[in-house]
From Swiss-Prot:
Any one of the GO CC terms: membrane
Gene3D superfamilies for the chain: Amino acid/polyamine transporter I (1.20.1740.10)
Biased composition (Polar residues): 533-548
Record's protein name: Solute carrier family 12 member 8
InterPro entries for this protein: AA-permease/SLC12A_dom, SLC12A_fam
Disease per UniProt entry: SLC12A8 has been identified as a possible susceptibility gene for psoriasis mapped to chromosome 3q21 (PSORS5).
Domain of life: Eukaryota
The entry's keywords: Chloride, Glycoprotein, Ion transport, Membrane, Potassium, Potassium transport, Symport, Transmembrane, Transmembrane helix, Transport
Keyword Transmembrane helix: yes
Record carries keyword Membrane: yes
Protein's cellular compartments: Membrane
Organism: Homo sapiens
Membrane topology (UniProt): Multi-pass membrane protein
């Protein structure tokens, strides 16, 4: 049996070795080797989320929150903040399962659903919010250092903030590998600081500073809210909400993860759950052991509770630095993705990256300058509402993205499930190539980047599609070679064209089908039935006593059967491809994603924005409208997004119209194709027939032949 020589790429062996080589873990990589570094669930997503959630607000404002809202309402406020963040995380997970998230994180997620114009607007506001949040974290760190050193001057606080910002800028420019290594160390120190606070609440007292220990009377006194002058539930909520703004940090790491489809959901949900538990512990312990006056006016009351005060201060400093570093990591990469997609042409220079991980040096410098500008504001309580409004607007966009994507997918009509008959044989020469892919959150590692779009991958697909064997010449007996009649020679000349076509595509017509069950279930029913009937007839003919020359002509009935149902098959295949966009993977967190909960979260977040600071909300919406129309004028050719067919206002109108009896339902409209009766069309032949090439077969010539015309000849 002879084997056909396969077409190989020039360096296909090296490409195969690179594709099969697994990326090394980050701790095994050499420090000064220029190679991309990818991370996993716990060292990448979980660490980044926890570092961003455990910020200045936890260490400096938890006691102030308990002193104003009390223990009971404080727990409710913390749970409500975490719930708003959890709804957004689940919405992001739902979008990631139905769509794809690139290296742009939040921007890529919103842009793929709502379009580049909306995604660019929300992405720029999110970057701005990250810069303001970084300034808030650095300011909190500088305030603590200045109090520790006895420096009450505001310029001392600003000088310390600028120095810390420059140090973090250097770490970010060094690469993501150093950021993750530093984050692991900082997370360990934060755990030690939290343990020191919990142990200190049991081991000692400090009545002079309001730490009097556990007392039922004290806990009862601190249970109900008692606000300071000028404070309310929503002002406290506005100050405390930035504590949960780090939940989207895992989505911003999509380009630096080995398996983003599995790492982002698991790491983000684990970080949210552990953070909620630790926040509840802090609120309960502070309300049970400290007086209300100390909780209100002493921002460092938790430092008096700790067993070793310097460990708590170390955790405060580390949390401030880590949260700011997380903002300096995510914001430049979002800005880089916006620049690479040319959403705003003026920012195209920020799309360049250096190193194997494409570190956005220019974007890091720009975000650092914006952060430095807000450092000079110098007050945490002033910066916190600005951060809250920007992040709440981003959460509204993410929640609405998942809702619109779900509603758009529900509006699709389902494709009928294919029914396969037992014992039926199908095509062996064409397996289904629309294999279901896992949801992509960004980079899939170097393995896929090597294979995608290369000749090696094309050859692999062709090997799967066509069995590269020539069983026809070796398996069929050669009979009657010596006594050939003119009729057999004529029959051989007739099949020359079809035999050449068969050899060109290397069809193996006698091989049994090899469709996997899970792949065959996704093929259209009409296509399966047509192929079964065609190939069942051919199998029965090939097993009979037929001459050698008629075997190649069995391809003609197959082409005839397929040409009759080609229109219906094309429609079903196109509908199948359209519905593949909305297929969801099954996992334990898939059932937690609900579009109606996302819609409720979007509406609730929008209302909370107006209640906290309606002035900041109106300013943000005005800026968003200006940026939106500017992007529409500067880049009019941006994609519309996966949910462009869904309109919230049309959906609301369709719900409200049946309830309004006075309004008539819209009449059905039918669009008719224009008639072309006045246009005459005729076919002509460009080259005239002559005797110069009479002996040459007619290649590249097609004709439509009915089954009835062919049957008398065979």
């Amino acid at each position: 049996m002879t084997q056909m020589s396969q077409v190989q790429e020039l360096f296909h062996e090296a490409a195969q070795q690179d594709a099969l080589a697994q990326p090394q873990p980050w701790w095994k990589t050499q420090l000064f080797m220029w190679e991309p570094v990818l991370f996993g669930t716990w060292d990448g997503v979980f660490t980044s989320c926890m570092i961003n959630i455990f910020g200045v607000v936890l260490f400096l404002r938890t006691g102030w929150l308990v002193g104003n809202t009390g223990v009971l309402l404080g727990m409710f406020l913390v749970s409500f903040v975490i719930l708003v963040a959890l709804v957004t995380v689940l919405s992001g997970i739902g979008v990631g399962e139905r769509s794809s998230i690139g290296s742009g994180g939040v921007y890529s997620m919103i842009s793929s659903v709502l379009g580049g114009q909306t995604g660019g607007t929300i992405g720029l506001l999110y970057v701005f919010g990250q810069c303001v949040a970084g300034a808030m974290y650095i300011t909190g760190f500088a305030e603590s250092i200045s109090d520790l050193l006895g420096l009450g001057n505001i310029w001392a606080v600003r000088g310390i903030s600028v120095a810390v910002l420059l140090a973090l800028l250097g770490i970010n420019l060094a690469g993501v590998k150093w950021i993750i290594r530093l984050q692991l160390l900082l997370l360990f120190l934060l755990a030690v600081s939290t343990l020191d606070f919990v142990v200190g609440s049991f081991t000692h007292l400090d009545p002079e500073h309001g730490f009097i220990g556990y007392s039922p009377e004290l806990l009862q006194n601190n249970t109900l809210p008692d606000y300071s002058p000028g404070e309310s539930f929503f002002t406290v909520f506005g100050v405390f909400f930035p504590a949960a703004t780090g939940v989207m940090a895992g989505f911003n790491m999509g380009g630096d993860l080995r398996e983003p489809a599995a790492s982002i959901p698991l790491g983000s949900l684990a970080a949210v759950g552990i953070s909620w538990f630790l926040y509840i512990i802090f609120v309960f312990l502070l309300g049970a052991i400290c007086t209300r006056e100390a909780l209100r006016y002493d921002f460092l009351i938790a430092e008096k509770v700790s067993l070793m005060g310097f460990l708590f201060l170390l955790g405060l400093y580390i949390s401030s630095l880590a949260s700011c570093m997380g903002g300096l990591y995510g914001a430049p990469r979002i800005l880089q993705c916006i620049a690479q997609e040319k959403v705003i042409p003026a920012l195209a220079c920020l799309g360049q990256g250096k190193g194997p991980n494409k570190t956005p040096v220019a974007a890091i410098c720009l975000t650092s300058l914006v952060t430095m500008a807000f450092v000079f504001v110098g007050q945490v309580n002033v910066l916190a509402p600005i951060v809250t409004i920007n992040f709440m607007l981003t959460y509204v966009a993410v929640d609405y993205s998942y809702f619109s994507l779900s509603m758009c997918s529900c509006s699709l009509t389902p494709v009928p499930e294919p029914v396969l008959r037992e014992g039926a044989e199908g095509l062996h020469c064409s397996e289904h190539l629309l294999l279901e892919k896992a949801p992509s959150y960004g980079s899939e590692g170097p393995a896929q980047r090597v294979l995608e779009g290369t000749l090696l991958e094309f050859t692999k697909d062709m090997d799967q599609l066509l069995q590269l064997t020539r069983k026809l010449e070796s398996s069929q007996p050669r009979q009657g070679e010596g006594n050939r009649t003119p009729e057999s020679q004529k029959r051989k000349s007739k099949k020359a064209t079809k035999q050449t076509l068969q050899d060109s595509f290397l069809l193996d017509l006698k091989s049994p089908p090899s469709f996997p069950v899970e792949i065959s279930d996704r093929l259209p029913a009409a296509s399966w039935e047509g192929q079964e009937s065609c190939w069942n007839k051919q199998t029965s003919k090939s097993e009979g006593t037929q001459p050698e020359g008629t075997y190649g002509e069995q391809l003609v009935p197959e082409l005839c059967n397929q040409s009759e149902s080609s229109g219906e098959d094309f429609f079903l295949k196109s509908r199948l491809q359209e519905q593949d966009v909305w297929r969801r993977s099954t996992s334990f967190y898939t059932h937690m994603c609900n579009p109606w909960v996302s819609l409720l979260g979007a509406v609730g977040s929008l209302l909370i924005m107006f209640v906290i600071q309606w002035v900041y909300t109106l300013v943000n919406m005005g800026v968003a409208a200006i940026v939106y129309f500017y992007i529409g004028r500067a880049s009019p050719g941006l994609h519309l997004g996966s949910a462009s067919n869904f309109s919230f206002f049309r959906w609301m109108r369709s719900l409200l119209l049946p309830s309004c009896r006075s309004l008539r339902s819209p009449q059905e409209q039918i669009i008719l194709a224009p008639s072309l009766a006045k246009v005459d069309m005729e076919m002509t032949q460009l080259t005239q027939e002559n005797a110069d090439f009479a002996t040459r077969d007619r290649y590249h010539h097609s004709s439509l032949v009915n089954r009835e015309q062919l049957m008398p000849h065979y």
